[in-house]
Amino acid sequence: MKPALKIAIAGLGTVGAGVIQLLDRQAELLAVRAGRRIIVSAVSARDRRRDRGVDLSAARWYEDAAAMAADPEIDVVVELIGGSEGVAPAVIEAALAHKKHVVTANKALMAEHGTRLAARAEE
């Protein structure tokens, strides 16, 4: 089996916590389908003390989501912050600058910056 795919999640609201829960619950099936384990190795959110109902003990915590996206140990950055300005585009820019794969469902960000970010991803 290949080395684990290390995921960083920026934004731990309802969707972010749900993604972590789903990845944990479906870990065996995902590992078989992907040919390697998929682990959440880093997270970032505004409030570290908030109880999100998921176990984050195995993940490194980052106060700065863009710094997390630049971490050389991370393979994929999942942006779940939302909004088209501020932190969300900075996280994606940092991830792309460090040749990371990026996952987002942020329609506002993609509508405003999608063309530029797609070009950046192709560099």
In which residue ranges do the predicted regions lie?
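Hydrophobic residues within beta-strands of alpha/beta enzymes
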Residues: V77, V102-V103
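N-terminal glycine-/serine-/threonine-rich beta1-alpha1-beta2 phosphate-ribose binding loop
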Residues: M1-A97
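Rossmann-fold NAD(P)-binding glycine/threonine-rich loop
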Residues: G83-H98, A105-E123
